[in-house]
Structure formats: C-alpha cells, structure tokens
Amino acid sequence: MARIATLVAVLAASAAVAAVAVASTRSPKALRTAIFAAARKEHSVHYVEHGAASVLRQTMVSDVAKTRGVQKITFTLQGEKGQFTVIVVNRIAYLRGNSLALHAYLGFTSAQTASYHGRWISIPPGNGRYEDLAASVTLPSFLHDIYPGAPLALVETTVGGRKITGVRGTSRQGGVTFQEAVLPDAKLRPLAVSDVDTKHGFVDAIKIGRWNEPVRVKAPASAVPIATVTAG
C-alpha cells in the first residue's frame, strides 16, 4: 500500500532528523518564527498527511485557504475501510462520511449513523464536535496545528538531494505529545512535517506544497444541523 511505504520512508527520515543537531547562526526559535511568518503571508496551501497507529492507517488530502477548506480522509481501522470529508466555509464545518467513519471513527450512535451516513451534517462553532472536525481545514488552523512548541532544536536532513535545516519541538494533540519536526522549502515556508510518539506508536507525516492555488469550496446544500442529528 502506497501510504504504508510513505510512512516507512518518513520514519527513516524523521529518525535522521531527530538524531542530527546542526550548528547555525539562526536560533531554533528564530527559524520557527521565520518559517511561520513566511507561511502566514500566503493565501492557501495543499497538503497530504499520512498517519498510522497500531490498528489505524489513514490519509488526509486537504486544500485550505484563510476562511475555507476541504479535507478528504480515507482510513483503514482494524482492517475495515472508511472515508469522510470535512468542509469549512465561513467558520461552519460540514461533515459527510460512510457508516464506519460516523460510528467507529467519529463516535455517532448506531441510530444516528443509520439515518445520516452519506448525508451532509453542519456543525457550528461552539458545538462539542466542532474543534476536532474543523482542525487544519483552514490555513490559520493548519499552521497552528503544525507549530512546534518548546523545547526547540535545529535539525538537518536531506530531501530530494538537498540538505534542509528545520526546527524540532513538541506538539500536543488529543492528549498525546509528539516529537515534531518542521522542514522549510527554499522560501522558508513549511515543506514537510513529521510527528512521532514512540510511547503509543503513533506516526504522522505531512507533505506540503502548491501554495496559493484557488480553493473553490462552497457550503453543501441541504446540510442537516448537528442538533437535529443528535436530538434523536
């Protein structure tokens, strides 16, 4: 499976990144500031994220802009395949998924899943599901989610034959603390991100590119409010 091969490659790369600290006139904090300052000047980005845990393999393909974006997620959970899509338009999240995604992955009840799989559901800010669903589906949210925290260190690896100096720190998501490395492109924008949690066996890798392409996303017609879905 292609995404498994990608994860293996990224594991090797992230191990190298974690192992090699480099000397530089720029401090880790200054490099982090420069990377995210460059990214915040842009209007949109495309990224592909591969993740793996003990019983889960997943791929997220996303196109995100300042106030809108779309994220398509495919996954295999304990050998079963699922998929769902999240759209964010003007701070409203819209979700559509198959039965496995709604019930086993996202925690909807069996009755809710039976009624609403394959249909768009709208989730406003303030709803308990909003934060997790809307995470990384706009450009500001994505940059927030890949921002490495202290302690910081400079790291070096080779991508496509080119040596790249990045910054390594920590990222806390869903109660799990990852060792996170962010590598910049030639314009100092994020190019690749790796997250590893050896304690729980979580691995995550993101390839970033195609900056400033149009993100044409509209709110789905006839979406069912989440309050209606959960009222039954």
Show where each model-derived region lies:
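N-terminal leader/targeting segments and the immediate start of mature chains
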Residues: 4-68, 150-158, 213-232
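Short, solvent-exposed coil/turn segments at beta-strand boundaries
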Residues: 39-44, 60-72, 87-93, 160-164, ...
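Beta-turn initiation residues at beta-strand->coil junctions
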Residues: 49-53, 73-78, 97-99, 171, ...
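Short, solvent-exposed loop/hinge segments that bridge or flank secondary-structure elements
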Residues: 53-61, 127, 131, 175-176, ...
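An acidic-aromatic
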Residues: 65-134, 203-205
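Transition segment at domain starts
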Residues: 132-144, 152-154
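Gly/Pro-enriched, hydrophobic low-complexity segments
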Residues: 155-224
